[in-house]
From Swiss-Prot:
Residues 234-248 have a biased composition (Pro residues). Belongs to the DP1 family. Residues 173-190 have a biased composition (Polar residues). It comes from the Eukaryota. This is HVA22-like protein h. It holds the Pfam family TB2_DP1_HVA22.
Length: 315
C-alpha cells in the first residue's frame, strides 16, 4: 500500500500536469483536430466534477483500503490513449444526466444570480450607513474634545465648608476674648438687647449650614419665649442712682494711662451686669405670680360659696 502523501503527488502529476500539457499541444497545432479537442474538453469536465465529489468521498470513504490508489488509476484510465475512458464515461453517464436536468440547473443559476445581486446591494447599503454613522460619531467626539469643558460646581461647594471652618476659629477667639474681658462682653450684649433685626437666611449649599441654621432658629425661638415671660413679670427694682462725678485726681490718672479701665467704669459695668435680668429668676417670678393669682381666685370663689350656703341653709 502506497502512502497517502505519495499518491497525492502522483495524482497531481498524472491527473493534472500531464493532461494539461497534452491539451496545450493539441490546441497549438496548426490544424487542430476537432475530435482531439472534444476529447480534452470532455476530460476536463469530468475532472472538475471529480474534484467536486472528491471532498465528500475523502471524508466518507478514505478508510477504504486502496482508496487513493483507485483514484489515481481512474485518472490514468480517463486519458490513457488505449483505453480512452473519457468518451465512455461522458457519453454513457455524464451527458444524459446533465441533459435531463439542464433546464432546472439553468433556472437555479438565474435565481442564484438575482439573489446574489440583491444581497450584494443590501450589504453595500448597510456598509454605507454604518460608515456614515461611524464618521458622524468620530466628528462629534472630536468636537467635544475641542470645546472647553465648564468648571464643575463641586469646587465651589467644597470651598464653602472650608470658609466656614476658617470662620469658626475666629468666632471662638472672639468669644474667649469676650469672656476674659467683661467690658467686651457688655458691649457685645448691649446691641443684642437694643437692636433686634430679622436674620436674613442665606443660601445654603451643604448639610452643615442647614444644621447651623436650625440651631440658630431654635435659639431665636427660645429668646422670644424668654422675652414674653419677662413682659408678664412685675416691674423690677428701680435703677441705681447715677455715679458721682469723677474727681480731678481720677481724671488725671485716666488721662495718664488710658489703657487701664477707671474704677467708675468698672462700677458701671458691674451695675449693668447686676441690672440685667436673669432668665431663670424671671421664669420663677412669672410662675410664682401666676400661682398667687390662682390662689387668690380660689379663695374668693370658696368664700362666695360659703356665703351662699350659709344664706340658703334653714334657720
Amino acid at each position: 500500500m502506497i502512502g497517502s502523501f505519495l499518491t497525492r503527488g502522483l495524482v497531481m502529476v498524472f491527473g493534472y500536469a500531464y493532461p494539461a500539457y497534452e491539451c496545450y499541444k493539441a490546441v497549438e497545432k496548426n490544424k487542430p483536430e476537432m475530435q482531439q479537442l472534444r476529447f480534452w474538453c470532455q476530460y476536463w469536465i469530468l475532472v472538475a466534477a471529480l474534484t467536486i465529489f472528491e471532498r465528500v468521498g475523502d471524508a466518507l470513504a478514505s478508510w477504504v483500503p486502496l482508496y487513493c490508489e483507485a483514484k489515481l488509476a481512474f485518472f490514468i484510465y480517463l486519458w490513457f490513449p488505449k483505453t480512452r475512458g473519457t468518451t465512455y464515461v461522458y457519453d454513457s453517464f455524464f451527458q444524459p444526466y446533465v441533459a435531463k436536468h439542464e433546464n432546472e440547473i439553468d433556472r437555479s443559476l438565474i435565481e442564484l444570480r438575482t439573489k446574489a445581486g440583491d444581497l450584494a446591494v443590501i450589504y453595500c447599503r448597510k456598509a454605507v450607513s454604518y460608515g456614515q454613522t461611524r464618521i458622524v460619531e468620530i466628528l462629534h467626539f472630536v468636537a467635544l474634545q475641542s470645546t472647553p469643558k465648564p468648571k464643575p460646581k463641586e469646587k465651589k461647594q467644597a470651598a464653602a465648608p472650608e470658609e466656614e471652618e476658617q470662620k469658626q476659629p475666629d468666632l471662638k477667639a472672639t468669644s474667649q476674648a469676650a469672656s476674659s474681658n467683661p467690658q467686651v462682653r457688655l458691649q457685645s450684649k448691649k446691641p443684642q438687647l437694643v437692636t433686634k433685626e430679622p436674620i436674613s437666611p442665606k443660601p445654603l449649599s451643604s448639610p452643615r449650614k442647614q444644621q447651623q441654621l436650625q440651631t440658630e432658629t431654635k435659639e431665636a425661638k427660645a429668646s422670644v419665649s424668654q422675652t414674653k415671660l419677662t413682659t408678664l413679670t412685675p416691674p423690677g427694682p428701680p435703677p441705681p442712682p447715677p455715679p458721682p462725678p469723677p474727681s480731678p485726681t481720677t481724671a488725671a490718672k485716666r488721662n495718664a494711662d488710658p489703657a487701664q479701665p477707671s474704677p467708675t467704669e468698672a462700677e458701671e459695668a458691674s451695675q449693668t451686669v447686676a441690672a440685667l435680668p436673669e432668665p431663670a429668676s424671671e421664669i420663677q417670678r412669672a410662675s410664682s405670680s401666676k400661682e398667687t393669682i390662682m390662689e387668690e381666685t380660689l379663695r374668693i370663689t370658696r368664700g362666695s360659696l360659703r356665703k351662699a350656703r350659709s344664706a340658703g341653709a334653714p334657720r
